[in-house]
């Protein structure tokens, strides 16, 4: 009985969306813009054209600055405060590999 009660009251991680880096062999994030709620988690996955990184402007705690070299490699980012979060792949920002996540 105690075990089932613990399962019921365990906090869950709120999943929101996936972002693909280098999707389809292009220097893009897909999607490059999305809207989520506070507490939601975004999974960022390296696509077909590595290496890439994921750097959130003014938020090093949300960033993954190390380059991901393996296709399919992924990590989760949880957004705990409302705001607009601009992100980019540092090596490919000049090619337009940028985006924004709106958290409300």
Identify the residue ranges that each predicted region occupies:
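Extracytoplasmic copper-binding redox domains, predominantly the cupredoxin/blue-copper superfamily
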Residues: 4, 8-104
């Amino acid at each position: 009985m105690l075990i089932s009660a613990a399962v019921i009251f365990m906090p869950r991680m709120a999943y929101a969306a996936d972002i693909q880096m280098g999707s389809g062999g292009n220097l893009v994030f897909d999607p490059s813009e999305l809207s989520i709620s506070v507490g939601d988690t975004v999974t960022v996955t390296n696509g077909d054209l590595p290496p890439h990184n994921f750097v959130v402007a003014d938020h090093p705690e949300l960033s993954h600055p190390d380059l991901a070299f393996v296709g399919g490699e992924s990590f989760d980012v949880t957004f705990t405060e409302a705001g607009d979060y601009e992100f980019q792949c540092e090596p490919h920002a000049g090619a337009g590999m940028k985006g924004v996540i709106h958290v409300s």
